[in-house]
Amino acid sequence: VTTQDFTHDIDTILCVGNGYWIFKGNKCLKTNMAGDKLLVDEIDITASGAWPALAGTRFARDLDSIAFSNESGYYWFLKGDSCIATNGDGNQIVCSERKIAGGGGWPALDR
C-alpha cells in the first residue's frame, strides 16, 4: 500500500549502486538506473534494508539532501544546518548529528 505520491514534491534523490533512492516524507523507494522498475517498493526510511540507524533521529523524515562517500562508504544525511552519517548498511550511526559547517561535517564551509 503506497502512502506517498512520488510524482511530485520529492525531498531528495540519491544515485548509488544499481539505482536511484527517492525520498519523500518518512518514505523511500528505489528504482533501477533506467527508472522504469522498482527495486525496493515504498518503505519507511528507517526500515530494514534502508537506514534503520536513523530511527529516533530527526533525519528519519523530510530530508534536504543525501550524499554517499565512495571513500568512506558512509551515507551523509543533511537537514537544516545539521548532518549525520550512517555506515554503508544503514544500520549504524558512524558520525553523530553535527553542524554541516564547522561542526565536523564540512569545516571548510565555516568561513
Describe each model-derived feature in a short phrase.
Residues 1-111:
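Disulfide-stabilized extracellular ectodomains of secreted/luminal proteins, especially beta-rich
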